[in-house]
Amino acid sequence: MLRIYLKIWNFEIRVYNMDGSSPAEFSELLTLSTDSVGAIEENQDEITVHYGNGIIKFPSKVSFNSVTWNLNCYCEPNVLQALRDWRRLVYDTETERMGLPTEYMRNVYFIKYDGQGNVRDVIKCPGTWIGALNNGEMNQQGGDIVKVTVPLVI
């Protein structure tokens, strides 16, 4: 039997609008800028129901942990601006306006490929938004690319 392994480096993230019909306006830019993604955990709690003298357990809805998304920061196209625009949909610090979930939530797909480029695994995380924006370190010592970190709240 031939075994084909999933490699940790063969993946992409796709960000879609909540209706799922079209990629978000910044989707391709952020996909191409991706450096790494933290582990995605699928959790399912139990619901305990008292029934007569006994207890019955049922599975709950699947939930996901928040995931750390690391991106390479490019000046053109502007990765930081695209992330800030998405974050401003959650809360705009200039107008002090809190956004509506339909405005800032996105469907995020984590897609893994095999060595031939065939899709082997897709994790869909509906209702995802940016929890914060770490703008990356700065120093005068080298020519390293700035790494931007974004926790995705799923």
List each model region and its residues.
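Glycine-rich, low-complexity intrinsically disordered segments
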Residues: 1-154
